[in-house]
From Swiss-Prot:
Name of the gene: PCDHGA11
Gene Ontology MF annotations: calcium ion binding
Gene3D superfamilies the record matches: Cadherins (2.60.40.60)
Organism: Homo sapiens
GO biological process assignments: cell adhesion; homophilic cell adhesion via plasma membrane adhesion molecules; nervous system development
Protein name (database record): Protocadherin gamma-A11
Keywords noted in UniProt: Calcium, Cell adhesion, Cell membrane, Glycoprotein, Membrane, Repeat, Signal, Transmembrane, Transmembrane helix
Highest taxon listed in the record's lineage: Eukaryota
Amino acid sequence: MANRLQRGDRSRLLLLLCIFLGTLRGFRARQIRYSVPEETEKGSFVGNISKDLGLEPRELAKRGVRIVSRGKTQLFAVNPRSGSLITAGRIDREELCETVSSCFLNMELLVEDTLKIYGVEVEIIDINDNAPSFQEDEVEIKVSEHAIPGARFALPNARDPDVGVNSLQSYQLSPNNYFSLQLRGRTDGAKNPELVLEGSLDREKEAAHLLLLTALDGGDPIRKGAVPIRVVVLDVNDHIPMFTQSVYRVSVPENISSGTRVLMVNATDPDEGINGEVMYSFRNMESKASEIFQLDSQTGEVQVRGSLDFEKYRFYEMEIQGQDGGGLFTTTTMLITVVDVNDNAPEITITSSINSILENSPPGTVIALLNVQDQDSGENGQVSCFIPNHLPFKLEKTYGNYYKLITSRVLDRELVQSYNITLTATDQGSPPLSAETHVWLNVADDNDNPPVFPHSSYSAYIPENNPRGASIFSVTALDPDSKQNALVTYSLTDDTVQGVPLSSYVSINSNTGVLYALQSFDYEQFRDLELRVIARDSGDPPLSSNVSLSLFVLDQNDNAPEILYPALPTDGSTGVELAPRSAEPGYLVTKVVAVDKDSGQNAWLSYRLLKASEPGLFAVGEHTGEVRTARALLDRDALKQSLVVAVQDHGQPPLSATVTLTVAVADSIPEVLADLGSLESLANSETSDLSLYLVVAVAAVSCIFLVFVIVLLALRLWRWHKSRLLQASEGGLAGMPTSHFVGVDGVQAFLQTYSHEVSLIADSQKSHLIFPQPNYGDTLISQESCEKSEPLLIAEDSAIILGKCDPTSNQQAPPNTDWRFSQAQRPGTSGSQNGDDTGTWPNNQFDTEMLQAMILASASEAADGSSTLGGGAGTMGLSARYGPQFTLQHVPDYRQNVYIPGSNATLTNAAGKRDGKAPAGGNGNKKKSGKKEKK
């Protein structure tokens, strides 16, 4: 059982040994060793770096291979052309390593592109460039003449900074009869020379002896140094001073303050007087120790006068001499050990770093390479390095005391744009010391964010009739990226509206996102537009986002109310509404119907009576437009009532339209016709003066034109007569070409072409000049033209029709109570209310409309000599052009209550033949047109 356990332990040890060797091999694989003698010239070859790194020489500069040195002086350099490591200056091994036997310089080789560190160790080989030397120029030794043979006297030590065989190897004493040389070993391996008395001295024979001490090294060639020694023979001094200890040992902390006592040596001499007084001094003291320690020659107290540094000198060995007044002395050794204290804080050196890193770089990206050193030893020199935990970075130890700072996760510039990384190094001393350094890192932007609109959708409003180029709305998209990646441009999608490209309606400023109208919008055409605004950044590749924008057109009060009923006829005539004199207050006469193309309150319509020939007789519904009687009709109320109705919307500013209504007030049709004659005579008197002026003006123009024609004709005849005379005198001449002037017939045609007609009607305030119209004033009206006259409406007492037609047309037709119309002239129904027993009121809408037209026409033709109205009061003739000029397909029938009492005429829809001969209308009224009533 025990054997098995031993075998298992051996197997484990073997496995651990293999692992250790593998690790050691991997460690050493990155360690490069070279050697170079000291004092070589600058640029001397040290080693082939490119070969040891496995790179071509031209790759060294490309990959950023460089030496990382912690010292102030760069002793080596890399030759990029040859790929060699060369010396960069003077190398003195004694200055670098002093008395250390093996001198190694360590440096690191950094490959920038991979951030790999390679250790390079260069051994400085010593050469024999220093000869042994003594500190004293001359040494004096006092020896009593009673000194017995074998007495030893200390001699000064020589110093050689070289090491090894080149260091101090031996001493030689010049030949003499009294003294010899012996070497005594020291604890550090060095040897002190001593002078040994070989025979008795006689002061009386020779008071002093001169000797030469020579020190030799082992170099090739051998170097040596010498110091003269003068031995003075003294009178009798029986006792030699004796130190209490042969060796004094003391440990001193390196941070001991200056002036502190280290120890006190003491030597006693039993002699009396001056021979018993001991004086203390250092012997063979090195210069470095003499700068730090001092010895009180009277008391033997050793003090510190300089500063100790464990990192430079850890141990001092000094020899102290005690000499009495008679010249006898003795020596002792003082060993001072410097104790390390944690007086050096760690040092952090940034070997390589980058100041910017692209966001979204993968974790593990190297940010910096740093080296941590502590000059202390032991735990005081053990250093740990760390960074704050909340940062997205971490430290990894690579080679020796090197660390690399890497990212631990993906960085986001939009969250943090830069980092101030604090690197802290702390040793394990008591108390621990620490050092800090900072690495500034900027996060470079990557186009990883599209533009973002603050809202998911937008609504914009623009009033209609806007000016072109008007600013409608402004959208803004934010891109959290920076620089070009955050430069946003705006555009619209390629859509169509009612088959028209969207770009013809609106445009957007690509830089500001302001939306502009390219044309004036009309609310009545379309009321809204759906747009999609695209925001695109300038990154590579560009990122974009879009948002919907609803553009609503706001209605403006740009349409005045449009009156549908009563419609304005194209020939300028007006319709007539009928109101019976027996109508009660509130009787519905007609209704004004209007619409407004706008919407909302811009389309709310109000009706009001703007003007009336008889104020207070009629009223208009504010919201309905119904025209009703406001009071009972009186006999004194005029037959013809004119009303001006205004229709106004509620827009800002309000728009309005007006319509003129003519209302005939009568109880019977004969009464209506009788009153119309008197009305026309009044109108005739009002316009007689104006008509006279117009006739005079036309006559004057005609006379001037006639004179012009006569002159033109005379000139033409004169030229014609002259040409005939020329033809008679020159019979051989060829015929003249046809003249370009017209003859008499042409003049007649000219006159016919430029003739004019003055048409004066009773209700017109101006004359109508009709051009061009042939003048047939000099011809008779044919029977055919009479037969083509317009149909007449014959009442019970028909008048004789004036004209130039057949006399049979002047015969009066027998009385008939039936009104007869052609199908094209049949009036519509204006009401269904019957009159009295003597007549029948029209019972359909079209009859009533025709009746209204006839009443207005009769009033217009009263003053015309060729009027078809004449004879009795019960006779009336109307041209077919005075028929209804409006349609009521959009207007409900509000005229069913129209009633004219006292009429003895009966209207019928029958299209039967008229009793008696059909009357024929005169041709004189063919060119006359009824005019609208003036207020």
